[in-house]
């Protein structure tokens, strides 16, 4: 399948479809139809907690077969998710059965005596680290580093383990559905692959790979990861750079090449992309990861936005590498009470920074039991505004299509400083250890975003592979830059230093935005050639689209065969934005993404283009399409019409009048009950107590009047008796909230006043 074919078929949102119960082909087909009705263009078949069909069993593959068949009939995209849970790599637990496959990490201890069990033992002498191989006179404190393992994840930096993962997962799909690869099955989603992030990561692969890369024994200075010494910056640089290489090449590169050789695509995301120090936890830099994806992706949790770092890292790499689509797995952990307005703001913040394809988290097969607590909200029939989902999805389909098929005006390159974080990163001190690099960088990129200066990030590994200089401009892959910005940083790769030296010698324009680096490849070096010749004020005059006082509006200027445009969004949740934006057009109109209508837009002509007027309410956005024949318009009042409300009004309920009983009293004998407790608390309490005995749960509600139809709906419960006001009943009707639920009319058993259900 060509990339262009994939884009035309895969422009609608594609949710995580949580396969979390006993999978029935007819129900799978029905849910696929519901997805299409909601404006979705496909799905990721994602094994998650609650799954009762055995993962990768014959029944599992029958479910896949039915889903692929239904997707083909409907012109939708079916994608495989490469794991049972996450992070990717452990093959549903099979690889964890062998201790040799488990992830490694390092533990550091100071001891009064030499410990032969340690991976490496060191002493500190006058600020220098020295490895010792036995007890020595005069050493009072031995610095010991231990190789430890964790039983929950595998060592994906080991090619042997990656190949085993592919054999146990991807090859199984190919054996069954090889003819559908690139047709009915678009490809695979990989989720949060990582080295062990909860301690200082390590892999035995380093014992050979470090010597190949640097001609030295990694154990000679391993203690420098934990001890500040003269050797620490250089060693840490070499260590973490190689860890990043092993992460991207031995896992992601290997999986990507397998997918390409089997006629399918790869998408997904790494983990903890939003800060430099969190990237150090997991992979030592996310941008090289994106080289090995057909559709690079990012993950964004919760209902807040952050700095532009996470979405702009992935979109920078995608544009440089010629990958049109950029995916976001988004909306997890936003909570049941999140509103469409909030979700629109979260998504548009990512889209204005270069994302263009939505993967909603989550579309559950079932919400029975704990399944309903799987990082909600859900974007399925369980959503109270499910009838409006299609409008929401249609909007982002149109926006994503326009962004994917356009080129961003971004000829400013900001060097990504993750390699400077290598010099000082210490897992024990975490964020504080790289704060001197991370904080100034966050301030800098927010300044660029607020000014509306189109920019990308330059990852030094990608620059080494794809960077070149010609006529005083720096190129990375398919993107060329007229300006380069060096943020506050401590080191440059030797390949980066060579590029910049060539760039400056050809008259390239360079801005130094902080501490000038003093090292190359982590070692002290002469960088006297690195002299800035560009100021912030000069860059603002030449490239800023937004006024200096702006805080909340972000924009992207786009050029495309079908029309050039500006997309702008007000990210504030409370403040209206009222400002002008400079555009290199002769005129603009406002484009409605839902109706496809063009409307007059306020602008006035200027010497070098126009000044378009923006008046954006909190969370509001606008798309201004170039139309050089448009006539300048004065800004109209945002209040189009006023009316006085009076008289009597009738309020209508858009859904059934329902009451959720989410608190219960717990008893172990049916006589003595606790106070009313939240049901999740009761569940956690029983798990802590490891209770395996008869229980009673008493729910209560009060009725002021008794309707003819008083329906009780609850989850299907095995080995359970149910009573209403002391009368035992059974419910047989199919539930409405979820098809696994049951319901029935209890009006005849209810009474005015207090009622109880046990």
Model feature map: region roles:
Residues 701-726, 757-758:
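Aromatic-lined ligand-binding clefts that engage carbohydrates, nucleic acids, or primary amines
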Residues 730-743:
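Aromatic-rich membrane-interfacial microdomains
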Residues 740-758:
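Short, surface-exposed tryptophan/glycine-enriched loops
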């Amino acid at each position: 399948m060509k990339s262009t074919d994939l884009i035309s078929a895969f422009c609608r949102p594609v949710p995580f479809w949580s396969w979390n119960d006993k999978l029935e082909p007819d129900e799978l087909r029905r849910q696929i139809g519901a997805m299409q009705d909601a404006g979705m263009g496909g799905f990721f078949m994602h094994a998650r907690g609650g799954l009762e069909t055995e993962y990768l069993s014959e029944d599992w593959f029958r479910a896949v077969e039915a889903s692929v068949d239904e997707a083909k009939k409907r012109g939708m995209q079916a994608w495989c998710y490469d794991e049972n849970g996450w992070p990717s790599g452990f093959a549903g637990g099979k690889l964890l059965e062998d201790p040799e496959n488990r992830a490694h990490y390092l533990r550091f201890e100071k001891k009064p005596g030499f410990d032969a069990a340690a991976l490496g033992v060191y002493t500190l002498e006058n600020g220098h680290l020295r490895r010792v191989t036995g007890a020595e006179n005069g050493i009072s404190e031995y610095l010991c580093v231990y190789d430890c393992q964790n039983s929950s994840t595998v060592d994906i930096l080991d090619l042997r383990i990656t190949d085993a993962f592919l054999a146990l997962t991807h090859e199984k799909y190919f054996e069954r559905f090889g003819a559908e690869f690139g047709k009915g099955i678009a490809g695979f989603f990989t989720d949060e692959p990582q080295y062990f992030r909860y301690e200082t990561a390590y892999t035995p692969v380093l014992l050979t790979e470090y010597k190949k890369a640097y001609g030295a024994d990694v154990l000679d200075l391993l203690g420098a990861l934990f001890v500040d010494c003269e050797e620490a910056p250089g060693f840490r640089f070499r260590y973490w750079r190689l860890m990043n290489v092993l992460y991207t090449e031995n896992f992601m590169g290997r999986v990507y090449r397998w997918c390409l050789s089997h006629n399918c695509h790869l998408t997904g995301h790494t983990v903890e992309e939003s800060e430099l120090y969190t990237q150090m936890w997991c992979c030592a830099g996310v941008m090289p990861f994106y080289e090995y994806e057909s559709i690079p992706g990012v993950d964004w949790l919760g209902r807040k936005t952050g700095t532009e770092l996470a979405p702009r890292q992935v979109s920078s790499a995608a544009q440089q590498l010629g990958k049109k689509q950029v995916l976001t797995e988004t909306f997890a952990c936003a909570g049941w009470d999140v509103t469409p307005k909030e979700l629109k703001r979260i998504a548009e913040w990512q889209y204005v920074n270069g994302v263009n394809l939505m993967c909603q988290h989550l579309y559950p097969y079932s919400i029975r039991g704990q399944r309903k607590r799987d990082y909600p909200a859900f974007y399925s029939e369980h959503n109270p505004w499910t009838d409006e989902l299609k409008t929401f999805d249609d909007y982002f389909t149109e926006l994503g299509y326009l962004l994917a098929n356009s080129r961003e005006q971004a000829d400013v390159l900001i060097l990504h400083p993750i390699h400077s974080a290598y010099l000082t990163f210490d897992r024990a001190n975490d964020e504080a250890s790289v704060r001197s690099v991370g904080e100034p960088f966050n301030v800098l990129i927010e300044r660029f975003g607020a000014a509306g200066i189109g920019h990308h990030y330059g990852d030094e590994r990608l620059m080494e592979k794809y960077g070149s200089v010609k006529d005083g401009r720096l190129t990375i892959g398919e993107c060329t830059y007229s300006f380069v910005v060096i943020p506050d940083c401590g080191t440059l790769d030797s390949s980066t230093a060579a590029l910049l030296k060539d760039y400056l010698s050809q008259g390239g324009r360079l801005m130094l935005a902080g501490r000038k680096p003093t090292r190359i490849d982590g070692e002290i070096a002469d960088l006297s050639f690195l002299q800035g010749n560009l100021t912030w004020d000069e860059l603002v005059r030449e490239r800023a689209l937004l006024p200096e006082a702006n805080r909340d509006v972000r924009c992207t200027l786009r050029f495309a065969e079908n029309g050039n445009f500006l997309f702008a969004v007000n990210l504030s949740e409370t403040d209206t934005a009222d400002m002008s934006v400079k555009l290199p057009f002769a005129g603009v109109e406002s484009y409605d993404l839902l109706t496809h209508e063009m409307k007059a837009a306020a602008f006035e002509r200027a010497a070098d283009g126009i000044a378009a007027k923006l008046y954006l309410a909190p969370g509001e956005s606008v798309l201004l399409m170039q139309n050089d024949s448009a006539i300048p318009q004065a800004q109209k009042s945002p209040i189009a019409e006023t009316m006085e409300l009076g008289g009597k009004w009738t309020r209508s309920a858009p859904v059934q009048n329902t009451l959720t009983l989410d608190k219960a009293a717990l008893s172990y004998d049916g006589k003595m009950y606790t106070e009313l407790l939240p049901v999740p608390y009761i569940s956690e309490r029983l798990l802590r107590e490891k209770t395996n005995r008869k229980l009673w749960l008493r729910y209560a509600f009060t009725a002021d009047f008794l309707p003819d139809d008083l329906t009780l709906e609850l989850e299907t419960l095995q080995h359970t008796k149910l009573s209403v006001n002391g009368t035992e009943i059974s419910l047989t009707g199919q539930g409405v909230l979820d098809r696994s639920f049951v319901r029935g009319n209890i009006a005849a058993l209810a009474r005015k006043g207090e009622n109880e259900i046990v």
